[in-house]
Amino acid sequence: MMPRMGPPAAARQDNPLHVSFRNPQWPPNFINKDNVLDYFCNQANAFYEMNSCNQQIRMQNIVNRTVEECLRTMPGIQYVLWYSQPPLFIICKQRRNNVTNVSPIAYYYVINGSVHQAPDMYSLVQSRLLGALEPLRNAFGEVTNYSRYNTAKGYYWEFKNKPNVKKREEEKKEDEEEKLEDRSTNFQKTRTMMLLNQLFSEMPAEDALEREEKEEVEEEEEETLKTEEPTTSTDEPKFAEPTARTTSKQ
């Protein structure tokens, strides 16, 4: 089996956003805008490059001119103080092309003696989106559990928190005392009209009228047949009683 190709572990660089630097020999309240660059330009700081213009000035030990004046005339990578509001300091890593042209590379902030790299816009937006997607996913999953559907009501919400029994009894009493008219929603109206139209298409009114006329004719024929049938009496025939004969004496 061939070994897996890839960069060695020593060549792999950590994410600079997860790296920080702190010098325990410097107390945080001692750092100010005049010495924050000296605090940042430390060989143990992973964000500091030894081939920068700041390191050249430190090696030359220039005293007559300030660091800002020296950096204006030196092309290359430089570290300058961009913003200062103790205990927060922002340092800009830039590349000076000439006296007037400067290209920023990265920004670092020093707060309470800890040095961190400021995230770029892509990393910031990506982190915020990832942080917002998980709560949104959980919220949508929770909401779908309360969604219900009914042909009469349509879509509605049914939450687990049930109202109190007393409120239900009061609502029932109010409904019994006050007779309200039946109300219907737009969904119910449209649904009812659709069902009626479907029934009318399946059973048109003309067929219903013809059926009624046929039924009436059949009923009339049955009545006429009943009247024409001879009536048979079950009573026995009655005969006249014989009159008594009277005999006359001569």
Curated annotation (Swiss-Prot):
UniProt region (Disordered), positions on chain: 166-250
GO cellular component, one term: core mediator complex
Pfam families named in the record: Med6
InterPro entries attached to this UniProt entry: Mediator_Med6, Mediator_Med6_met/pln, Mediator_Med6_sf
Keywords noted in UniProt: Activator, Developmental protein, Nucleus, Transcription, Transcription regulation
Main location per the UniProt record: nucleus
GO molecular function, one term: transcription coactivator activity
Annotated compartments: Nucleus
Domain of life of the native organism: Eukaryota
Subunit structure: Component of the Mediator complex. Interacts with let-19/mdt-13. Interacts with RNA polymerase II. Interacts with mdt-28.
Its biological purpose: Component of the Mediator complex, a coactivator involved in the regulated transcription of nearly all RNA polymerase II-dependent genes. Mediator functions as a bridge to convey information from gene-specific regulatory proteins to the basal RNA polymerase II transcription machinery. Mediator is recruited to promoters by direct interactions with regulatory proteins and serves as a scaffold for the assembly of a functional preinitiation complex with RNA polymerase II and the general transcription factors. Acts to repress beta-catenin target genes.
Protein's recorded name: Mediator of RNA polymerase II transcription subunit 6
Organism: Caenorhabditis elegans
